[in-house]
Regions:
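Extended catalytic cores of very large enzyme megasubunits
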Residues: 1-179
Length: 179
């Protein structure tokens, strides 16, 4: 009841996942079709979005040893849900769009050329799909070489920008190297 109509419209139109989400009944039991397959559809409530984000952030924290106890992890998750629901905090758009789609719903997509630092090995690793290690950052400053077709050049910049734009990020570029 504290959300304005504009905030509600943005949440529903921009941040609710539109497809691939397991549908559940009022008791939380998965709905199945006549073949026994889980029915997939959109997110239908803000609570689903808040759960998707906060449970994933908690999972990542537990996975990397961030919390001293399970109680600390639960408090973190509960406080995040409260802050999101009351609009005390809000992540950037790529977080709303991408975070938790794999962890919460098991969604995968084709690898898109994203890389991440593996928390266990500390090594740069290419992502195996689009959502298990999503690209959650909002803004990137890129450089460009004075070259049309080779790596680091003008056409390569287009590819890098497309990868970032696809998942909701934005970019700026330092063009000072161009003639």
């Amino acid at each position: 009841s504290t959300w304005s109509q504009v905030a509600t419209d943005i949440m529903v139109s921009k941040y609710f996942r539109k497809a691939g989400v397991p549908q559940v009944d009022e008791g939380g039991k998965a709905l199945k079709d006549e073949n026994g397959d889980v029915v997939l559809g959109p997110e239908t409530s803000s609570r689903q979005v808040f759960d998707r984000l906060s449970e994933t952030w908690r999972h990542w924290g537990e996975e990397t040893g961030y919390f001293a106890t399970k109680k600390d992890a639960q408090a973190f998750e509960d406080e995040l849900k409260y802050m999101l629901a009351t609009q005390m905090a809000a992540p950037n758009s790529p977080q709303w769009f991408n975070t938790g789609l794999n962890y919460k719903y098991g969604l995968e997509g084709p690898a898109q050329g994203f890389w991440y630092v593996d928390p266990k090995s500390g090594k740069l690793t290419e992502g195996k799909d689009s959502y298990s290690r999503p690209q959650p950052h909002a803004c990137f400053i890129q450089s460009i070489d004075d070259d049309l077709v080779n790596e680091g050049g003008i056409m390569d910049l287009w590819v890098k920008e497309a990868r970032l734009f696809k998942f909701g990020s934005g970019t700026g570029t330092n063009f000072s190297n161009l003639r």
